[in-house]
Amino acid sequence: ILQDRMTYIFFDEIQHVSDFPDIINSLNLKPTVDLYVTGSNAYMLSSEIATLLSGRYIEIAMLPLSFKEYVEGTDSSNNLPQAYTDYITRSSFPYTIELGTYSEIIDYLTGVYNTIVVKDIMARKRLPDVMMLESVIRFTADNIGNILSTKRIADIMTADGRKIDQKTVERYLSALCETFFVYETKRYNIKGKQLLKTLGKYYLVDIGLRRMLLGSRSFDAGRILENIVYLELLHRQKKVYVGKMDSLEVDFVAIDENNISYYQVAATVRDETTLQRELASLQQINDQYPKYILTLDEDPTADYDGIKRVNALRWMMGDVSL
């Protein structure tokens, strides 16, 4: 390391090296070192490391491609519905754009999955049963967008012949969240403006992985869109929660500094009953923050007493003035 000029150091997956927090800290203390550290799980920012580097690092969260990035990467802006179909049936991982056939994509996603499950989760967490972990993964993938508790997951899986207790479910889900394979979204009491401790939702980092895991039964347009919108809000650096308004649910409460926005997500609201159901929870919120219904319907933007119905694809592309 030179003393009279900057030295740029890049570490990838350094969490696999013993005593790596001490290595990072010692280098970070040197005034002529600019240090970049990447890691594929939340252990990189565990309390021990955060304490060592307190106030001296900037965290940049990385995600697979957003829909807009995918469209730009595939040069498919002339047909957004087809681009969206490709986005959810192939994958949002950048490398898959270079792959020609669906079988090649499945092979690649299988490799990603095995790396996360076997090398990252099973090895580091020392979980005892890879088959049970895979059962939890498939159950979670099949229930994206559903309100869940670890007890309910344990009860349903046990009833289906895969006996598992609540503590084991908690341990496995925690491991999945730490590797960013799954994201947990907590509930937020809109009226009381506080987080609730129970009954959140889970979303996958990539819908292509869901299709790989579940096959032909993976297609549920509404829940897939909900997962995609959740990831888009993360791309926009929002803190995202599931909203609770009395007995009603708001799909997403997105908070950014002092700004709040509310979202309902549905594949279509052309049926009047569906539209009224999606409007109902938003109409109960008595504040002036923006409220949206995002849908795949290719209809002009509409306004229902301040609640905007917007095409989700145009919203993700940033083409809609909100």
For each of these PLM feature ranges, what is it?
Residues 298-322:
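Domain-level recognition of nuclease-like catalytic cores that cleave nucleotide substrates
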Residues 40-42, 46-147, 180-183:
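Interdomain motor-coupling "hinge/lid" segment immediately C-terminal to the ATP-binding subdomain
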Residues 14-37:
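Conserved Walker B catalytic segment
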Residues 260-270, 278:
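Active-site ExK catalytic segment of metal-dependent nucleases
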Residues 2-20:
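Conserved P-loop NTPase "ATPase switch" module shared by AAA+ and STAND
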Residues 245, 286-306:
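Nucleic-acid nuclease catalytic cores
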Residues 10, 34-40, 61:
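Structural recognition of the conserved hydrophobic beta-strand(s) that form the central parallel beta-sheet
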Residues 101-260:
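Accessory nucleic acid-recognition modules appended to NTPase machines
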